[in-house]
From Swiss-Prot:
GO CC field: chloroplast; mitochondrial small ribosomal subunit
CDD domains: RPS2 (cd01425)
Pfam families with a match to the protein in the record: Ribosomal_S2
PANTHER family the UniProt entry points to: 30S RIBOSOMAL PROTEIN S2 PROKARYOTIC AND ORGANELLAR, SMALL RIBOSOMAL SUBUNIT PROTEIN US2M
A molecular-function term among this protein's GO annotations: structural constituent of ribosome
Protein name: Small ribosomal subunit protein uS2c
Similarity-based family: Belongs to the universal ribosomal protein uS2 family.
Chief location category: plastid
NCBIfam families associated with the record: rpsB_bact (TIGR01011)
Coiled coil, from the record: none
InterPro entries: Ribosomal_uS2 (IPR001865), Ribosomal_uS2_bac/mit/plastid (IPR005706), Ribosomal_uS2_CS (IPR018130), Ribosomal_uS2_flav_dom_sf (IPR023591)
Family matches, as Gene3D superfamilies: Glucose-6-phosphate isomerase like protein, domain 1, Helix hairpin bin
GO biological process: translation
Species per Swiss-Prot/TrEMBL record: Gracilaria tenuistipitata var. liui (Red alga)
Length: 231
């Protein structure tokens, strides 16, 4: 049984691709037709591939695997944080710092710094510092929160990464390929499916399309982890 209906996908605008002249020919198998110079994605395949992806994700979550959600563009940022938090996953929704995965030990030291500053803030220690020093600490805390808040509880590399907008998140995808971290990705018509482990062809620009797909993925993570707890 499909995890999503064609009418839900249509309503969310998941079928709208990019202008035909901007396409990646490798996406041809997932394109239904061209209309007014815009490629239309085959939603039958979207529903099938999303269902298969969610079954895989549920099984992985049941085994205790951890997921990192990534989407730094405006349309995705809110959904990414919301669904990652809901499913007890990690997320990056502001800026991908180069080496976030491939140079994890350095990034981890910044995460530990964030944790220390937050503890100092909660204990009121920052307020007790001289005015200038307190201001420096608060600026540092704000910057670290902005970039690292979604991974501050991540003690090791994630088992899987869920990506919105392959073209934008190239650096992260290259890091995952280098480290062998499987990539689950919403693929628009300008993307390359050959470098993605679990492709989900769909509109990666429309908020409703992003939310529909990412929330189904989060549901599957929750189902898997809940089943494991109640075993």
């Amino acid at each position: 049984m499909s995890i999503v209906s064609l009418s839900e996908l249509l309503e969310a605008g998941a079928h709208f691709g990019h202008q035909a002249r901007r396409w990646n020919p490798r996406m041809f198998p997932y394109i239904y037709t061209e209309r007014n110079g815009i490629h239309i994605i085959d939603l039958v395949q979207t529903a099938q591939l999303l269902t298969e992806a969610c079954q895989f994700i549920r099984d992985a979550s049941q085994e205790g695997k951890k997921f990192l959600f990534l989407g730094t563009k405006r349309q995705a940022a809110g959904v990414i944080a919301e669904q990652a938090i809901r499913s007890n996953s990690y997320y990056v929704n502001q800026r991908w710092l180069g080496g976030m995965l491939t140079n994890w030990m350095t990034i981890k030291s910044r995460v530990e710094r964030l944790q220390r500053l937050e503890m100092d803030e909660q204990a009121g220690l920052i307020d007790m510092l001289p005015k200038k020093e307190a201001a420096i600490n608060r600026r540092e805390l704000d910057k670290l929160r902005k970039n690292l808040n979604g991974i501050k509880n991540m003690s090791r590399l994630p088992d899987f990464i869920v990506v919105v907008d392959q073209k934008r998140e190239t650096t992260a995808i290259q890091e995952c390929i280098k480290l062998g971290i499987p990539i689950i990705c919403i693929l628009d018509t300008n993307c390359n499916p050959e470098i993605i482990d679990i492709p989900i062809p769909a509109n990666d620009d429309a908020i409703r399309s992003i939310k529909l797909i990412i929330s189904r993925i989060a549901d599957s993570i929750i189902e898997g982890s809940t089943y494991a707890l109640n075993k």
